[in-house]
Every structure is written in C-alpha cells, then in structure tokens.
C-alpha cells in the first residue's frame, strides 16, 4: 500500500463524517449513516444537528454500526457568549443521546479582549456533558492571529475540553496547517490526552497526510488515534475512497 493509500485509510478511520446544512432532513442523515459504513471500514463518527440524533441512532443500530459515535453541535455556528444558552443546548444534546458534543467557543468575545467568558462557557458545558466527549471549536480562521489561536486553545484545555477543533466549516477560512501547528503545540505543552480536530477544507488524502504529519511530528506517531485525532469533513470521504480505488472520482463540490 502506498503512503497516500495508507493516509487515506487512516483518515477514514479518524473521520467525523458531517452534515450540518440548513436543508438537512431525516433522509439525508439516514444516507449519511449508510455512507459512514464504508468499504474501507467505518468512520469514527458522524456529526449532525441534535434533532437528528434519534434517527441516526436507529439507523446505525440497524446497520450493526454501533461503534460509530454520534457527534452534534451546540452554540453553533456563531459562538455566542451566552453561557446559559450554550449549557442548555449542550444538556439537550446529551439528553438526545449524543456521544460527543462540538461546542463553539465565544471567539468574538476573545477577539474583543474577554478571556473569562470562553473559559467559563467551556467549563460549564463540560460539566453538562459529564462523560460525553466535548470538542471545542475555536474558529481559528476568524481568530487568524496566532496569539489568539494559541489563547483560545489554552483556555479551552484549561476549562476541560477533551478536543480542540479548528472550525465550524461555516466561515471562509477553515482548517489550516498553520493553525494545526499552534493548536497541537498547545496540546503538547498542556495535556497530551486532549485531542485535535481539523475541520473543513481537507479535500484529499494528500492534505489529510499533511495534517497527520504535523500531529506525528509534534506529538509522536503513537499519539494519533480516534481518541485524539479526528477529521471533520463531508466531501473528503469520496476522495479517500477514490484514492483507495473503492469509488469513482468525486464530483467537484462546495462541501465542508
């Protein structure tokens, strides 16, 4: 197996296969569950809006794919600074049966100089999650400034995040290697049990390999696993299956 094929295989096993569109329906989520069961093995998780968790759970159970985790989003996509609402949404997501919650950090508040609200929001949402995995989306493409990306990562980890994630996929700049370097470095300094999730903009096996390479260089080859590394993506899967010669070449897409 070539290095590119190895990267494609790994990326599938590390993927949060995602649909977070305004026109999502039960049928689109059912289709996503079927796609997550790939000829190259199951993806790590699917990521969907909270209201679709019950139909996703039913579908994955019917497919015998109980190992696929169900992730959802809260305080999404704008990263508002209302802690009470973020906590209520997170509690509701857990009550719906989410295995993992991806919450958006109040990044605009941080850009305006308010560090405390981000810390308090993540801390409160982690308490609401209990054993459910909490991934914190810092929206690195909007923060842009390396110092802000670093600070959002530090605050999230200090507040109890299980993962830090680059992006919502709803802004012009999503996952970048530059942001990955900063975020993975903070993990190496603070707590290597915290995971990293580049999301949006990873289009093919070569780009996936680049992100995996940065993680391995900073944290070691043994660090990367579904417990510590995920790709958030919608259009990436078809490209990876094509690399593995298990699907036709993907059509051009505007997908996440």
Curated annotation (Swiss-Prot):
At the top of the EC hierarchy, this enzyme's class is lyase
Pfam families registered for this protein in UniProt:
DeoC
Could you list this entry's UniProt keywords, alphabetically sorted.
Cytoplasm, Lyase, Schiff base
Catalytic residues in the record: 102 (proton donor/acceptor), 165 (schiff-base intermediate with acetaldehyde), 197 (proton donor/acceptor)
Give the metabolic or biological pathway.
Carbohydrate degradation; 2-deoxy-D-ribose 1-phosphate degradation; D-glyceraldehyde 3-phosphate and acetaldehyde from 2-deoxy-alpha-D-ribose 1-phosphate: step 2/2
Task: Please state the protein's primary subcellular location.
Answer: cytoplasm
* Catalytic activity, reaction form: 2-deoxy-D-ribose 5-phosphate = D-glyceraldehyde 3-phosphate + acetaldehyde
- Coiled-coil positions are none
State its Enzyme Commission number(s): 4.1.2.4
Tell me if Cytoplasm is a UniProt keyword of this record: yes
Query: Its Gene Ontology molecular function terms?
Result: deoxyribose-phosphate aldolase activity
Concerning InterPro entries, the annotation shows: Aldolase_TIM, DeoC, DeoC/FbaB/LacD_aldolase, DeoC_typeII
Protein location: Cytoplasm
GO CC, one annotated term? cytoplasm
Gene Ontology process terms (BP): 2-deoxyribose 1-phosphate catabolic process; carbohydrate catabolic process; deoxyribonucleotide catabolic process
Q: Which HAMAP family match?
A: DeoC_type2
Please describe what this protein does.
Answer: Catalyzes a reversible aldol reaction between acetaldehyde and D-glyceraldehyde 3-phosphate to generate 2-deoxy-D-ribose 5-phosphate.
The text of the family note is: Belongs to the DeoC/FbaB aldolase family. DeoC type 2 subfamily.
Its protein name is Deoxyribose-phosphate aldolase
Can you name the source organism? Shewanella sp. (strain MR-4)
Q: Which gene encodes it?
A: deoC
């Amino acid at each position: 197996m070539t290095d590119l094929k190895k990267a494609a295989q790994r990326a599938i096993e590390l993927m949060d296969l995602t649909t977070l569109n305004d026109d999502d329906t039960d049928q689109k989520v059912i289709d996503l569950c079927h796609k997550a069961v790939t000829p190259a093995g199951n993806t790590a998780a699917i990521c969907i809006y909270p209201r679709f968790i019950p139909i996703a759970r039913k579908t994955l159970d019917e497919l015998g794919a109980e190992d696929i985790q169900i992730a959802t989003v809260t305080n999404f996509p704008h990263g508002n600074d209302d802690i009470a609402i973020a906590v209520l949404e997170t509690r509701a997501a857990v009550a719906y049966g989410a295995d993992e919650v991806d919450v958006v950090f109040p990044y605009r508040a941080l850009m305006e100089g308010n560090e405390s609200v981000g810390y308090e929001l993540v801390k409160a949402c982690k308490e609401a999650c209990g054993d459910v995995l909490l991934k914190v989306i810092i929206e690195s493409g909007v923060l842009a400034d390396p110092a802000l990306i670093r600070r959002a990562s530090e605050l999230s980890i200090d507040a109890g995040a299980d993962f830090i994630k680059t992006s919502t996929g709803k802004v012009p700049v999503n996952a970048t290697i530059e942001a990955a370097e900063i975020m993975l470095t903070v993990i190496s300094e603070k707590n290597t049990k915290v995971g990293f999730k580049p999301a949006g903009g990873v289009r093919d096996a070569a780009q996936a390999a680049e992100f995996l390479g940065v993680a391995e260089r900073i944290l070691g080859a043994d660090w990367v696993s579904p417990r510590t590394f995920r790709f958030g993506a919608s259009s990436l899967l078809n490209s990876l299956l094509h690399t593995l010669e298990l699907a036709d070449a993907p059509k051009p897409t505007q997908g996440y």
